[in-house]
Amino acid sequence: MKKLMLAMAMVAAMAASAEMKVGTVDLMLLVRNHPNYDSNKALLTSTDKDYQKKLEGVKAEGDKLQEEGKKLMEQMRNPMLTAKAKADVERELGEIQQKLMGIEQRYRSEAMRCRQDLQDLEGRLLKTTTDDLRKRLAVFAEKGGYDFIYDVNAVPYAKKGYDVTDEMLKALGVDPKDAKGRDEGK
Protein backbone atom coordinates (compact mmCIF):
# COMPACT_ATOMS: atom_id res chain seq x y z
CA MET A 1 0.00 0.00 0.00
CA LYS A 2 2.89 2.35 0.80
CA LYS A 3 4.40 1.65 -2.61
CA LEU A 4 1.08 2.42 -4.28
CA MET A 5 0.76 5.72 -2.41
CA LEU A 6 4.36 6.62 -3.25
CA ALA A 7 3.78 5.77 -6.90
CA MET A 8 0.59 7.84 -6.95
CA ALA A 9 2.42 10.77 -5.35
CA MET A 10 5.18 10.46 -7.95
CA VAL A 11 2.63 10.38 -10.75
CA ALA A 12 0.88 13.45 -9.38
CA ALA A 13 4.15 15.35 -8.99
CA MET A 14 5.37 14.43 -12.45
CA ALA A 15 2.00 15.17 -14.01
CA ALA A 16 2.19 18.68 -12.66
CA SER A 17 5.55 19.26 -14.34
CA ALA A 18 5.00 17.53 -17.70
CA GLU A 19 2.46 15.64 -19.75
CA MET A 20 2.80 11.95 -18.94
CA LYS A 21 1.61 8.87 -20.74
CA VAL A 22 0.09 6.36 -18.31
CA GLY A 23 -1.55 3.01 -18.95
CA THR A 24 -3.16 0.18 -17.04
CA VAL A 25 -3.12 -3.51 -17.80
CA ASP A 26 -4.98 -6.54 -16.43
CA LEU A 27 -1.97 -8.67 -15.50
CA MET A 28 -4.06 -11.73 -14.55
CA LEU A 29 -5.76 -11.67 -17.94
CA LEU A 30 -2.35 -11.54 -19.58
CA VAL A 31 -1.16 -14.48 -17.45
CA ARG A 32 -4.20 -16.54 -18.53
CA ASN A 33 -3.44 -15.77 -22.17
CA HIS A 34 0.34 -16.15 -22.05
CA PRO A 35 1.71 -18.67 -24.58
CA ASN A 36 2.94 -20.90 -21.71
CA TYR A 37 -0.33 -20.87 -19.73
CA ASP A 38 -1.86 -24.04 -21.19
CA SER A 39 1.37 -26.05 -21.00
CA ASN A 40 1.94 -24.85 -17.42
CA LYS A 41 -1.60 -25.85 -16.48
CA ALA A 42 -1.14 -29.26 -18.14
CA LEU A 43 2.14 -29.77 -16.25
CA LEU A 44 0.46 -28.93 -12.94
CA THR A 45 -2.44 -31.28 -13.72
CA SER A 46 -0.17 -34.19 -14.69
CA THR A 47 2.07 -33.61 -11.66
CA ASP A 48 -1.00 -33.61 -9.42
CA LYS A 49 -2.18 -36.87 -11.01
CA ASP A 50 1.25 -38.42 -10.43
CA TYR A 51 1.11 -37.40 -6.78
CA GLN A 52 -2.41 -38.82 -6.46
CA LYS A 53 -1.23 -42.16 -7.89
CA LYS A 54 1.61 -42.23 -5.38
CA LEU A 55 -0.82 -41.54 -2.53
CA GLU A 56 -3.24 -44.17 -3.82
CA GLY A 57 -0.39 -46.69 -3.70
CA VAL A 58 0.25 -45.90 -0.03
CA LYS A 59 -3.50 -46.09 0.66
CA ALA A 60 -3.73 -49.47 -1.11
CA GLU A 61 -0.91 -50.74 1.09
CA GLY A 62 -2.89 -49.67 4.15
CA ASP A 63 -6.10 -51.22 2.82
CA LYS A 64 -4.30 -54.53 2.28
CA LEU A 65 -3.07 -54.51 5.88
CA GLN A 66 -6.55 -53.70 7.14
CA GLU A 67 -7.91 -56.73 5.31
CA GLU A 68 -5.23 -58.89 6.93
CA GLY A 69 -6.25 -57.44 10.29
CA LYS A 70 -9.92 -58.28 9.66
CA LYS A 71 -9.00 -61.88 8.85
CA LEU A 72 -7.01 -62.13 12.07
CA MET A 73 -9.94 -60.68 14.02
CA GLU A 74 -12.14 -63.40 12.56
CA GLN A 75 -9.63 -65.99 13.76
CA MET A 76 -9.72 -64.44 17.25
CA ARG A 77 -13.45 -65.15 17.43
CA ASN A 78 -12.84 -68.86 16.93
CA PRO A 79 -13.57 -70.52 20.29
CA MET A 80 -11.36 -73.46 19.32
CA LEU A 81 -8.14 -71.38 19.42
CA THR A 82 -5.59 -72.44 21.98
CA ALA A 83 -4.12 -69.86 24.32
CA LYS A 84 -0.82 -69.95 22.40
CA ALA A 85 -2.55 -69.53 19.03
CA LYS A 86 -4.62 -66.67 20.46
CA ALA A 87 -1.44 -65.00 21.74
CA ASP A 88 0.18 -65.40 18.31
CA VAL A 89 -2.85 -63.81 16.60
CA GLU A 90 -2.84 -60.94 19.12
CA ARG A 91 0.87 -60.38 18.47
CA GLU A 92 0.27 -60.33 14.70
CA LEU A 93 -2.62 -57.90 15.20
CA GLY A 94 -0.34 -55.62 17.21
CA GLU A 95 2.27 -55.72 14.45
CA ILE A 96 -0.36 -54.90 11.84
CA GLN A 97 -1.63 -52.03 13.97
CA GLN A 98 1.92 -50.64 14.24
CA LYS A 99 2.41 -50.96 10.49
CA LEU A 100 -0.94 -49.25 9.86
CA MET A 101 0.05 -46.34 12.09
CA GLY A 102 3.31 -46.03 10.16
CA ILE A 103 1.48 -46.10 6.83
CA GLU A 104 -1.01 -43.50 8.04
CA GLN A 105 1.84 -41.24 9.15
CA ARG A 106 3.67 -41.80 5.86
CA TYR A 107 0.47 -41.01 3.92
CA ARG A 108 -0.04 -37.72 5.78
CA SER A 109 3.58 -36.61 5.38
CA GLU A 110 3.63 -37.65 1.72
CA ALA A 111 0.35 -35.78 1.08
CA MET A 112 1.78 -32.65 2.72
CA ARG A 113 5.01 -32.92 0.73
CA CYS A 114 3.11 -33.43 -2.52
CA ARG A 115 0.86 -30.45 -1.81
CA GLN A 116 3.90 -28.28 -0.98
CA ASP A 117 5.80 -29.43 -4.09
CA LEU A 118 2.77 -28.65 -6.25
CA GLN A 119 2.44 -25.17 -4.72
CA ASP A 120 6.17 -24.56 -5.24
CA LEU A 121 5.93 -25.65 -8.87
CA GLU A 122 2.91 -23.43 -9.43
CA GLY A 123 4.76 -20.50 -7.87
CA ARG A 124 7.85 -21.05 -10.05
CA LEU A 125 5.74 -21.31 -13.21
CA LEU A 126 3.78 -18.17 -12.32
CA LYS A 127 6.99 -16.27 -11.57
CA THR A 128 8.48 -17.29 -14.92
CA THR A 129 5.32 -16.16 -16.71
CA THR A 130 5.04 -12.85 -14.86
CA ASP A 131 8.75 -12.14 -15.37
CA ASP A 132 8.27 -12.66 -19.11
CA LEU A 133 5.18 -10.44 -19.09
CA ARG A 134 7.05 -7.69 -17.24
CA LYS A 135 9.80 -7.78 -19.88
CA ARG A 136 7.22 -7.62 -22.65
CA LEU A 137 5.44 -4.77 -20.85
CA ALA A 138 8.72 -2.87 -20.56
CA VAL A 139 9.33 -3.24 -24.31
CA PHE A 140 5.72 -2.25 -25.05
CA ALA A 141 5.95 0.79 -22.75
CA GLU A 142 9.26 1.88 -24.27
CA LYS A 143 7.95 1.59 -27.83
CA GLY A 144 4.67 3.30 -26.94
CA GLY A 145 6.28 6.10 -24.99
CA TYR A 146 4.55 5.21 -21.71
CA ASP A 147 5.91 6.67 -18.49
CA PHE A 148 4.00 4.20 -16.29
CA ILE A 149 1.90 1.09 -16.81
CA TYR A 150 0.07 -0.11 -13.70
CA ASP A 151 -1.71 -3.35 -12.97
CA VAL A 152 -5.40 -2.43 -13.04
CA ASN A 153 -5.94 -4.42 -9.83
CA ALA A 154 -3.45 -2.20 -7.95
CA VAL A 155 -5.15 1.06 -8.91
CA PRO A 156 -8.42 2.02 -7.19
CA TYR A 157 -9.73 3.71 -10.33
CA ALA A 158 -8.58 4.29 -13.89
CA LYS A 159 -10.45 5.46 -16.97
CA LYS A 160 -11.03 2.77 -19.57
CA GLY A 161 -9.00 4.87 -22.01
CA TYR A 162 -5.84 4.06 -20.07
CA ASP A 163 -6.31 0.29 -20.46
CA VAL A 164 -3.68 -1.20 -22.80
CA THR A 165 -4.56 -4.84 -22.07
CA ASP A 166 -5.93 -5.42 -25.59
CA GLU A 167 -2.72 -4.12 -27.16
CA MET A 168 -0.67 -6.42 -24.91
CA LEU A 169 -2.92 -9.37 -25.82
CA LYS A 170 -2.25 -8.63 -29.48
CA ALA A 171 1.48 -8.53 -28.70
CA LEU A 172 1.06 -12.02 -27.18
CA GLY A 173 -0.64 -13.15 -30.40
CA VAL A 174 -4.12 -13.34 -28.87
CA ASP A 175 -7.23 -11.75 -30.35
CA PRO A 176 -8.69 -9.68 -27.49
CA LYS A 177 -12.21 -10.94 -28.33
CA ASP A 178 -11.02 -14.52 -27.82
CA ALA A 179 -9.06 -13.86 -24.62
CA LYS A 180 -9.45 -16.50 -21.90
CA GLY A 181 -10.82 -15.18 -18.63
CA ARG A 182 -12.14 -11.91 -20.07
CA ASP A 183 -15.52 -12.16 -18.36
CA GLU A 184 -14.46 -14.07 -15.23
CA GLY A 185 -15.15 -12.16 -12.07
CA LYS A 186 -17.53 -9.67 -13.73
Show which residues each predicted segment covers.
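Hydrophobic h-region of N-terminal signal peptides that target proteins for export
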Residues: 6-17
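Amphipathic, charged alpha-helical segments and their helix-to-coil junctions
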Residues: 19-186
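Positively charged n-region of N-terminal signal peptides that target proteins for export
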Residues: 1-4
